[in-house]
Protein backbone atom coordinates (compact mmCIF):
# COMPACT_ATOMS: atom_id res chain seq x y z
CA UNK A 1 0.00 0.00 0.00
CA UNK A 2 1.24 3.47 -0.93
CA UNK A 3 -0.49 6.54 0.46
CA UNK A 4 0.01 9.66 -1.66
CA UNK A 5 -0.82 13.06 -0.17
CA UNK A 6 -2.20 15.29 -2.91
CA UNK A 7 -2.90 19.03 -3.01
CA UNK A 8 -4.98 20.72 -5.71
CA UNK A 9 -4.29 24.44 -5.98
CA UNK A 10 -7.57 26.15 -6.92
CA UNK A 11 -7.41 29.85 -7.74
CA UNK A 12 -8.55 32.63 -10.05
CA UNK A 13 -5.86 33.39 -12.66
CA UNK A 14 -4.81 36.90 -13.57
CA UNK A 15 -4.72 38.43 -17.02
CA UNK A 16 -0.94 38.16 -17.12
CA UNK A 17 1.58 35.67 -15.81
CA UNK A 18 2.87 38.21 -13.30
CA UNK A 19 -0.59 38.54 -11.76
CA UNK A 20 -1.14 34.79 -11.72
CA UNK A 21 2.21 34.03 -10.15
CA UNK A 22 1.45 36.50 -7.37
CA UNK A 23 -1.74 34.58 -6.55
CA UNK A 24 0.03 31.21 -6.70
CA UNK A 25 2.82 32.39 -4.40
CA UNK A 26 0.23 33.63 -1.93
CA UNK A 27 -1.57 30.30 -1.83
CA UNK A 28 1.38 27.92 -1.68
CA UNK A 29 3.93 30.14 0.03
CA UNK A 30 2.29 29.98 3.43
CA UNK A 31 1.05 26.42 3.12
CA UNK A 32 2.58 24.20 5.79
CA UNK A 33 1.24 20.76 4.89
CA UNK A 34 3.61 17.96 3.90
CA UNK A 35 2.68 16.80 0.41
CA UNK A 36 3.71 14.21 -2.15
CA UNK A 37 2.00 15.74 -5.19
CA UNK A 38 0.93 19.32 -5.90
CA UNK A 39 -1.31 19.89 -8.92
CA UNK A 40 -2.07 23.21 -10.62
CA UNK A 41 -4.95 23.92 -13.04
CA UNK A 42 -4.97 24.49 -16.77
CA UNK A 43 -4.51 28.15 -17.78
CA UNK A 44 -2.50 28.78 -14.60
CA UNK A 45 -0.35 31.27 -16.49
CA UNK A 46 -3.29 33.55 -17.32
CA UNK A 47 -6.98 33.59 -18.14
CA UNK A 48 -7.03 33.74 -21.96
CA UNK A 49 -10.72 34.60 -22.27
CA UNK A 50 -11.12 37.32 -24.90
CA UNK A 51 -7.39 38.03 -25.13
CA UNK A 52 -5.58 38.52 -28.44
CA UNK A 53 -3.54 35.52 -29.62
CA UNK A 54 -0.52 37.77 -30.06
CA UNK A 55 -0.67 38.89 -26.42
CA UNK A 56 -0.92 35.30 -25.20
CA UNK A 57 2.05 34.34 -27.38
CA UNK A 58 4.01 37.23 -25.87
CA UNK A 59 3.34 35.90 -22.38
CA UNK A 60 4.15 32.31 -23.38
CA UNK A 61 7.53 30.75 -22.60
CA UNK A 62 9.68 27.77 -23.47
CA UNK A 63 10.11 24.90 -21.02
CA UNK A 64 13.42 26.36 -19.93
CA UNK A 65 11.90 29.71 -18.95
CA UNK A 66 11.26 31.31 -15.59
CA UNK A 67 7.66 30.09 -15.32
CA UNK A 68 8.57 26.41 -15.34
CA UNK A 69 11.65 27.28 -13.29
CA UNK A 70 9.40 28.50 -10.47
CA UNK A 71 7.61 25.14 -10.29
CA UNK A 72 10.85 23.19 -10.51
CA UNK A 73 12.15 25.18 -7.55
CA UNK A 74 8.88 24.60 -5.70
CA UNK A 75 9.22 20.84 -6.21
CA UNK A 76 12.79 20.64 -4.96
CA UNK A 77 12.20 23.04 -2.06
CA UNK A 78 9.04 21.26 -0.88
CA UNK A 79 10.36 17.77 -1.71
CA UNK A 80 7.10 17.24 -3.61
CA UNK A 81 6.22 16.23 -7.14
CA UNK A 82 4.49 19.00 -9.09
CA UNK A 83 2.14 19.03 -12.07
CA UNK A 84 2.16 22.51 -13.59
CA UNK A 85 0.79 24.12 -16.75
CA UNK A 86 1.88 26.84 -19.13
CA UNK A 87 1.32 28.39 -22.50
CA UNK A 88 4.36 27.17 -24.40
CA UNK A 89 5.55 28.89 -27.57
CA UNK A 90 4.85 26.72 -30.60
CA UNK A 91 6.34 26.54 -34.07
CA UNK A 92 3.16 28.14 -35.40
CA UNK A 93 3.19 31.68 -33.96
CA UNK A 94 1.08 33.33 -32.70
CA UNK A 95 -0.38 30.00 -31.55
CA UNK A 96 0.87 28.37 -28.35
CA UNK A 97 0.76 24.88 -26.90
CA UNK A 98 -1.43 24.20 -23.87
CA UNK A 99 1.27 22.31 -22.01
CA UNK A 100 1.52 20.25 -18.82
CA UNK A 101 4.84 19.44 -17.16
CA UNK A 102 5.34 16.73 -14.55
CA UNK A 103 8.20 17.45 -12.17
CA UNK A 104 9.77 15.05 -9.67
CA UNK A 105 10.90 15.77 -6.10
CA UNK A 106 14.34 16.79 -7.30
CA UNK A 107 12.95 19.46 -9.62
CA UNK A 108 13.55 17.49 -12.83
CA UNK A 109 10.97 17.42 -15.61
CA UNK A 110 9.96 13.78 -16.13
CA UNK A 111 6.97 14.25 -18.42
CA UNK A 112 5.57 16.79 -20.89
CA UNK A 113 2.13 16.78 -22.49
CA UNK A 114 0.66 19.20 -25.03
CA UNK A 115 -3.13 19.13 -25.08
CA UNK A 116 -4.33 17.23 -28.14
CA UNK A 117 -8.11 17.81 -28.10
CA UNK A 118 -9.04 21.50 -28.17
CA UNK A 119 -12.15 23.14 -26.73
CA UNK A 120 -13.99 24.28 -29.85
CA UNK A 121 -17.58 23.97 -28.59
CA UNK A 122 -20.23 26.09 -26.87
CA UNK A 123 -19.12 29.23 -28.70
CA UNK A 124 -15.46 28.97 -27.67
CA UNK A 125 -12.60 28.32 -30.10
CA UNK A 126 -9.45 27.26 -28.30
CA UNK A 127 -7.91 26.46 -31.69
CA UNK A 128 -7.83 30.19 -32.48
CA UNK A 129 -4.77 30.56 -30.25
CA UNK A 130 -3.64 27.02 -29.38
CA UNK A 131 -1.91 24.45 -31.59
CA UNK A 132 -2.74 20.83 -30.71
CA UNK A 133 -0.13 18.35 -29.56
CA UNK A 134 0.47 15.24 -31.60
CA UNK A 135 0.41 12.37 -29.09
CA UNK A 136 -1.09 11.26 -25.80
CA UNK A 137 0.88 11.29 -22.56
CA UNK A 138 2.70 8.12 -21.60
CA UNK A 139 2.30 7.50 -17.84
CA UNK A 140 5.32 8.11 -15.61
CA UNK A 141 6.24 6.91 -12.11
CA UNK A 142 6.37 9.84 -9.68
CA UNK A 143 6.00 10.04 -5.91
CA UNK A 144 4.54 6.57 -5.54
CA UNK A 145 2.07 6.84 -8.43
CA UNK A 146 1.96 5.63 -12.01
CA UNK A 147 0.55 8.92 -13.30
CA UNK A 148 -1.21 9.81 -16.54
CA UNK A 149 -2.21 13.26 -17.79
CA UNK A 150 -5.21 14.70 -19.63
CA UNK A 151 -6.39 18.31 -19.86
CA UNK A 152 -9.85 19.71 -19.12
CA UNK A 153 -11.99 19.20 -22.29
CA UNK A 154 -10.35 15.81 -22.76
CA UNK A 155 -12.55 14.49 -19.95
CA UNK A 156 -15.10 14.22 -22.76
CA UNK A 157 -12.89 11.72 -24.63
CA UNK A 158 -12.87 8.33 -22.83
CA UNK A 159 -10.19 7.03 -25.20
CA UNK A 160 -7.62 9.48 -23.82
CA UNK A 161 -8.01 7.87 -20.40
CA UNK A 162 -8.42 4.31 -21.63
CA UNK A 163 -5.10 4.31 -23.47
CA UNK A 164 -3.27 5.55 -20.37
CA UNK A 165 -5.01 3.02 -18.12
CA UNK A 166 -3.97 0.24 -20.49
CA UNK A 167 -0.43 1.61 -20.23
CA UNK A 168 -0.56 1.13 -16.47
CA UNK A 169 -1.79 4.47 -15.11
CA UNK A 170 -3.11 4.23 -11.54
CA UNK A 171 -4.27 7.83 -11.63
CA UNK A 172 -4.81 10.45 -14.31
CA UNK A 173 -4.34 14.06 -13.33
CA UNK A 174 -6.56 16.58 -15.12
CA UNK A 175 -5.57 20.26 -14.95
CA UNK A 176 -8.76 22.12 -15.90
CA UNK A 177 -10.07 25.57 -16.71
CA UNK A 178 -13.71 24.48 -16.69
CA UNK A 179 -15.81 27.37 -17.96
CA UNK A 180 -18.95 28.38 -16.10
CA UNK A 181 -22.34 27.71 -17.68
CA UNK A 182 -25.62 25.84 -17.22
CA UNK A 183 -25.02 22.42 -15.64
CA UNK A 184 -21.25 22.73 -16.15
CA UNK A 185 -20.37 21.80 -12.54
CA UNK A 186 -22.56 18.70 -12.79
CA UNK A 187 -20.97 17.80 -16.13
CA UNK A 188 -17.48 18.06 -14.65
CA UNK A 189 -18.36 15.75 -11.77
CA UNK A 190 -20.16 13.16 -13.90
CA UNK A 191 -17.35 12.96 -16.45
CA UNK A 192 -14.66 12.62 -13.78
CA UNK A 193 -16.64 9.84 -12.08
CA UNK A 194 -17.19 8.02 -15.37
CA UNK A 195 -13.52 8.15 -16.36
CA UNK A 196 -12.53 6.77 -12.95
CA UNK A 197 -15.07 3.95 -12.86
CA UNK A 198 -14.65 2.67 -16.42
CA UNK A 199 -10.84 2.59 -16.14
CA UNK A 200 -10.65 1.71 -12.42
CA UNK A 201 -8.29 4.61 -11.72
CA UNK A 202 -8.12 7.74 -9.61
CA UNK A 203 -9.08 10.91 -11.50
CA UNK A 204 -7.48 14.02 -10.02
CA UNK A 205 -8.99 17.31 -11.24
CA UNK A 206 -7.33 20.62 -10.36
CA UNK A 207 -9.68 23.36 -11.57
CA UNK A 208 -9.52 27.12 -11.86
CA UNK A 209 -12.02 29.26 -9.98
CA UNK A 210 -13.31 32.76 -10.66
CA UNK A 211 -15.67 34.86 -12.74
CA UNK A 212 -15.12 32.61 -15.76
CA UNK A 213 -14.43 29.23 -14.13
CA UNK A 214 -16.32 26.79 -11.92
CA UNK A 215 -13.81 25.66 -9.34
CA UNK A 216 -14.89 22.24 -8.01
CA UNK A 217 -11.44 20.63 -7.95
CA UNK A 218 -11.93 16.99 -7.00
CA UNK A 219 -10.44 13.54 -6.54
CA UNK A 220 -12.48 10.52 -7.64
CA UNK A 221 -11.54 6.99 -6.58
CA UNK A 222 -11.42 3.83 -8.78
CA UNK A 223 -15.05 3.01 -7.94
CA UNK A 224 -16.20 6.41 -9.17
CA UNK A 225 -16.73 7.83 -5.68
CA UNK A 226 -15.84 11.49 -5.11
CA UNK A 227 -13.25 11.44 -2.32
CA UNK A 228 -13.03 15.22 -2.03
CA UNK A 229 -14.79 18.12 -3.76
CA UNK A 230 -13.15 21.50 -3.31
CA UNK A 231 -16.29 23.51 -4.00
CA UNK A 232 -15.73 27.17 -4.84
CA UNK A 233 -13.21 29.80 -3.79
CA UNK A 234 -9.44 30.05 -3.81
CA UNK A 235 -7.89 27.33 -1.69
CA UNK A 236 -5.58 24.34 -1.47
CA UNK A 237 -7.68 21.18 -1.60
CA UNK A 238 -6.14 18.13 0.09
CA UNK A 239 -6.75 14.43 -0.41
CA UNK A 240 -4.98 11.13 0.29
CA UNK A 241 -4.75 8.52 -2.46
CA UNK A 242 -4.32 4.85 -1.58
CA UNK A 243 -2.81 3.06 -4.59
CA UNK A 244 -3.75 -0.35 -3.19
CA UNK A 245 -7.41 0.54 -3.77
CA UNK A 246 -6.74 0.56 -7.53
CA UNK A 247 -5.66 -3.09 -7.46
CA UNK A 248 -8.37 -4.19 -5.03
CA UNK A 249 -10.97 -2.59 -7.30
CA UNK A 250 -9.46 -4.19 -10.40
CA UNK A 251 -9.68 -7.62 -8.77
CA UNK A 252 -13.41 -7.10 -8.26
CA UNK A 253 -13.93 -5.28 -11.56
CA UNK A 254 -11.32 -6.47 -14.10
CA UNK A 255 -12.65 -4.13 -16.78
CA UNK A 256 -9.29 -3.58 -18.47
CA UNK A 257 -8.58 -7.31 -18.57
CA UNK A 258 -12.00 -8.15 -20.01
CA UNK A 259 -11.96 -5.50 -22.72
CA UNK A 260 -11.72 -6.84 -26.29
CA UNK A 261 -9.29 -4.17 -27.36
CA UNK A 262 -8.09 -5.68 -30.65
CA UNK A 263 -11.67 -6.10 -31.83
CA UNK A 264 -12.56 -2.58 -30.76
CA UNK A 265 -9.50 -1.21 -32.55
CA UNK A 266 -10.68 -2.78 -35.80
CA UNK A 267 -14.17 -1.40 -35.22
CA UNK A 268 -12.69 2.07 -34.70
CA UNK A 269 -10.70 1.81 -37.91
CA UNK A 270 -13.81 0.84 -39.83
CA UNK A 271 -15.91 3.56 -38.21
CA UNK A 272 -13.50 6.39 -39.09
CA UNK A 273 -12.56 5.11 -42.54
CA UNK A 274 -13.59 7.67 -45.23
For each predicted feature, which ranges?
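Active-site catalytic loop in hydrolytic enzyme cores
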Residues: 91-167, 180-190, 252-255
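Short loop/turn motifs at secondary-structure junctions
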Residues: 5, 33-34, 146, 168
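CN hydrolase (nitrilase-like) catalytic-core segments centered on the catalytic cysteine
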Residues: 61-83, 156-237
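Short beta-strand scaffold segments in enzyme catalytic cores
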Residues: 84-86, 99-102, 138-140, 217-219, ...
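Non-catalytic interaction/Regulatory regions outside core domains
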Residues: 9, 137, 150-152, 171, ...
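Cys-nucleophile CN-hydrolase/nitrilase-fold catalytic domain and related Cys-dependent amidase chemistry
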Residues: 17, 22, 26-106, 112, ...
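C-terminal beta-strand edge segments of enzyme domains
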Residues: 112, 208-274
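Active-site-proximal beta-strand elements of phosphoester/diester hydrolases
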Residues: 3-15, 39, 112, 139, ...
Amino acid sequence: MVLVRVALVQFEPGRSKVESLRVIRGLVGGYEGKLDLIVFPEYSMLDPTGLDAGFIYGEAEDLGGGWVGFFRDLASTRNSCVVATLFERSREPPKVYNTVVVIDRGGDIVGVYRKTHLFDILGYRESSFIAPGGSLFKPVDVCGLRLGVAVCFELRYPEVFRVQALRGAEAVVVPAGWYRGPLKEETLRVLAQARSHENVIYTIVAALYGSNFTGRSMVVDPYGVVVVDGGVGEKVVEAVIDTSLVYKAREKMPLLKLGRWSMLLEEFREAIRP
